[in-house]
Amino acid sequence: MLCLSLNSSSTSPPKSPLHHSFSRRSMRSWVCSPRVQRKKLGFWSSPKAVLSAVSGAGSEAGKVEEAEEYDAIVIGSGIGGLVAATQLAVKGARVLVLEKYVIPGGSSGFFQRDGFTFDVGSSVMFGFSDKGNLNLITQALEAVDCKLRTIPDPTTVHFHLPDNLSIRVHREYDMFISELVNYFPHEKEGIRRFYNECWKIFNSLNSLELKSLEEPMYLFGQFFRKPVECLTLAYYLPQNAGDIARKFIKDPQLLSFIDAECFIVSTVKALHTPMINASMVLCDRHFGGINYPVGGVGGIAKALANGLVNKGSKLLYKANVTKILLKDGKAVGVKLSNGREFFAKTVISNATRWDTFGKLLKVEDIPQEEKNFKKIYLKAPSFLSIHMGVKAFVLPPDTDCHHFILEDNWGRLELPYGSIFLSIPTVLDPSLAPEGHHIFHIFTTSSIENWEGLSHKEYEEKKELVADEIITRLEKKLFPGLKDSVVLKEVGTPKTHRRFLARDSGTYGPMPRKVPKGLLGMPFNTTAINGLYCVGDSCFPGQGVIAVAFSGVMCAHRVAADLGIEKKAPVLDAALLRLLGWLRTVA
């Protein structure tokens, strides 16, 4: 039996660019219909799938009773939350996921317009390989008996940078290094030495069984099995990519290129990007590669949600959590905006830390550790996003799927609207658009402060003005005739992202206030409130698909240990958590 379909053609067009809606008829068809052609679907499942993972607005996947106590409640169904939930469900825990919206996925969701299927967030998908231990999306799907069909991307990203610097990051590592050396022959040795450092970290991480770094029995077990790899990671934990790069590279333009590489990873330059984060991305794009799921990125969350239900746990949509309930200082449940309350032994928040500790808890309940977190990290900016349907003639032959554009001034890299990230997923999967058309998905940084205090008319006019400027830049740099090719356009601002993704200020995630000590300051999954855990991009190791999936795996392991499902050592637990807490204070 097919697990899910990724192509629901009867979607009614909602009002906002990030609003996703479904008709009950189309949802029943992708769950139940055995006649849908397999090649039009993104994945397969074992013959267990019976319930829809997307049951419609305000409905439930699995009957949800308020009086029932769960082992874990997960607030939000982003990739981090879904990985944590499914990993716990597979271990036998009874999990309830509460999603504010009407489909799962958050930033990894999708929406449809006039035959176009758009990814809400990034189309650059890591974690789908069939080797190593960092193929975390593959592992998460396999755990719930699902598999997605994917299309390999031969080029991770094509950089278009100042001084006509045009570099393709080829899937084949040697091709990428050769292209980079061709531009910077005098830095040949430095290039290889810097990226070799990245590989040293990646290979160490990729060799380990990935579980919670807050669980001492696992941590010590890995150390005794792989001492060299563990010591390697410990050595690089407090270091940043920019410092390592400067040990080997002197050319300022090449260092600026590495800034651009890291900016894609973390929204900050290399000197502020932890070396471990950079290494995961800069190496996995060549090891496992970028692989796009057939039918769109939204299929990942839909598969995990469906798998969660198949494993006996539950998912409630249109469930807006407004409060985390505490009893004697312990998290015991949540309250929804409609007054419903649900109770569990543990609560896992997939919201940002600003939402979790700024909105879901009373001010007097916020621990000092979370106040310290806000002293080290601030909210990264949000994005202006433009989703467009365009006529196919505008694409030159052999156009790459992903592009990063910074035309004439390295100093504009981090500024609002300074750099542009463009995805054209139809280069890989034409089924996402009507015949003869392509999808353009454009991102550029923007802060919510720039969109506040406007009347509706002023807001709409500003959206059109800023979008037109961005499109004009793309037309001038890469795609002559782009404006005339546009058949559909949806513009999302930081206010859009705040509303539909439930992220404070629409933020991309945490960003260090000053030069960080690598990842030392980044909290793990446990919090100072007993029974409350966090998962997602506000936790170690940070932003990105691999990172939030890793966070989900770690969180599930730690929660399972605390529930008694996994082995634990209470005395060692307390000592390790104190040590990790102390390390964060020196960051």
Swiss-Prot record:
Stretch forming the transit peptide: 1-50
**Cited function:** Carotene cis-trans-isomerase that converts 7,9,9'-tri-cis-neurosporene to 9'-cis-neurosporene and 7,9,9',7'-tetra-cis-lycopene (also known as prolycopene) into all-trans-lycopene. Isomerization requires redox-active components, suggesting that isomerization is achieved by a reversible redox reaction acting at specific double bonds. Isomerizes adjacent cis-double bonds at C7 and C9 pairwise into the trans-configuration, but is incapable of isomerizing single cis-double bonds at C9 and C9'.
Q: Which GO terms describe its molecular function?
A: carotenoid isomerase activity; oxidoreductase activity
Which residue spans adopt a coiled-coil conformation according to this UniProt entry? Answer: none
Its primary localisation, in coarse terms, equals plastid
Give the family per the record: Belongs to the carotenoid/retinoid oxidoreductase family. CrtISO subfamily.
Query: What's the protein name?
Result: Prolycopene isomerase 1, chloroplastic
UniProt keyword terms in alphabetical order: Carotenoid biosynthesis, Chloroplast, FAD, Flavoprotein, Isomerase, Membrane, NAD, NADP, Plastid, Transit peptide
Task: Note the InterPro entries from the entry.
Answer: Amino_oxidase, CrtISO, CrtISO-like, FAD/NAD-bd_sf
**Compartments (UniProt record):** Plastid, Chloroplast membrane
Catalyzed reactions: 7,7',9,9'-tetra-cis-lycopene = all-trans-lycopene
Instruction: Tell me the name of the encoding gene.
Output: CRTISO1
Tissue expression, as annotated, is:
Up-regulated in the flower buds and flower lip tissue, while it is weakly expressed in leaves.
Q: How does it sit in the membrane?
A: Peripheral membrane protein
